Design a protein with these regions (language model features):
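Non-transmembrane, aqueous-exposed alpha-helical and coiled segments at domain scale
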Residues: 1-147
Length: 147
């Protein structure tokens, strides 16, 4: 399933770039796959970019498990072929309407975005260290690169 963003046609995003003249389509944010990627790569931090594209959505749906008629799983199987016949189990999180264009500190971000990022951290067991709305607008919560 996808979210549609037809009412933003002709507008500019937080980076100042024109939005597509077509409908923008958003898939479900798959936290099961992200948790797996963090685990197999021994990630100690996550960077989430283009959060400006989610501003204005009433809800943001995230995948927290996969299910079929035989039950549900919360991990990525060894072979993706094993997911045949499964469907995403989703949870709806509150969206936010505020633009992220002027935010320079984590504390300035909308409360619903704080909740979203906290949920991502809880499910993946990995902190979100970098938050970005555009190349010029990023918030680094903990400096993870040195040198």
């Amino acid at each position: 399933e996808r979210f549609r963003d037809a009412d933003r046609r002709g507008q500019k995003d937080d980076a100042g770039a024109p939005t597509a003249s077509d409908e923008r389509s958003y898939g479900v944010f798959d936290l099961v796959a992200l948790r797996h990627a963090c685990a197999v790569n021994s990630a100690d931090g996550i960077a989430i970019t283009r959060l400006d594209t989610l501003a204005g959505l009433d809800t943001i749906r995230v995948c927290v498990a996969y299910e079929n008629d035989g039950g549900s799983i919360v991990t990525v199987p060894e072979s993706l072929a094993e997911l045949e016949g499964y469907r995403a189990v989703t949870k709806s999180l509150d969206g936010w309407s505020e633009s992220l264009g002027e935010s320079r500190r984590y504390e300035e971000l909308p409360g619903a975005l704080h909740d979203f990022l906290g949920f991502v951290e809880d499910v993946t067991e990995t902190p979100v260290e970098v938050i970005s709305a555009s190349p010029e607008n990023r918030i680094v919560r903990r400096k993870i690169w040195t040198g």
